[in-house]
């Protein structure tokens, strides 16, 4: 088992580049390195500089490599497709200008990856974690989303050689078990893989261990996070947006929550997964003073159980 443990700017509350409380990007890189990570995601489009001449020296200074960039946007609306493709070209151009990640032995596709996440729908945002009441897309709108995902993935791969991976996410139109199964049926593995996230699987009512086992044949990239069960129970009983729940502390350092990480370690070994795992812990950026301690604690816990 060859694993490269990475982190992401969301651990510092970076999910919306327009949030006025975001920490400086240089601080995020510095603290990621201090916590023992050697890989980091770009975060939302435009948080880290899109100019490789600025970003590459900062990465070199902190001994970090970029493991992924992310499309975190409305994948459903046809009118948004030009923006999705603009971001795809921008992210992939930057990724190709940065030093490449070393491919791990046994890894299916070398990083960096392009992570694709649907987001930006109020009705689904307020229904995060509630499969019973979350409105589903009709056939035409689902087909449009699949077409847009294919377009993004094909540009990433055929133009830049970057593997696209689809990330089911709380509050988006790919969240619950039925949507994940439908996605896998509609998007073949040669077009895009999966980035499964233990925290989002649990939030959506799925068992992370069982889900990773079920979709191991499609799994190219992993996200690890943990959930505070007390806060989770509270927010599920409120009318609340997903990131408002994160601001309440629903995500916690790995090993302090409800997810069974020793079981996940055993499963990762059993499956022979090789490659990258990115640690995440969404929060309000106004609480980023605790980020260094939290990401360091998550890294130490994972190392202690064998990752």
Describe each region flagged by the PLM.
Residues 16-21, 39-54, 74-80, 124, ...:
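Acidic-and-aromatic substrate-binding clefts and catalytic sites of carbohydrate-active enzymes
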Residues 3-9, 40-42, 66-70, 112-116, ...:
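Hydrophobic faces of well-ordered beta-strands that scaffold small-molecule active sites
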Residues 19-23, 123-130, 231-244:
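Short, flexible, mixed-charge acidic loops at enzyme active sites
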Residues 1-23:
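Boundary/entry segment of secreted carbohydrate-active catalytic domains
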Residues 39-40, 142-253, 258:
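Acidic/histidine-rich catalytic cores of soluble enzymes
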Residues 65, 80-194:
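Active-site acidic/histidine proton-transfer and metal-coordination neighborhood
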Residues 7, 32, 40, 59, ...:
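Conserved, mostly hydrophobic/aromatic
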Residues 1-2, 29-34, 49-68, 89-111, ...:
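Acidic (Asp/Glu)-rich catalytic clusters
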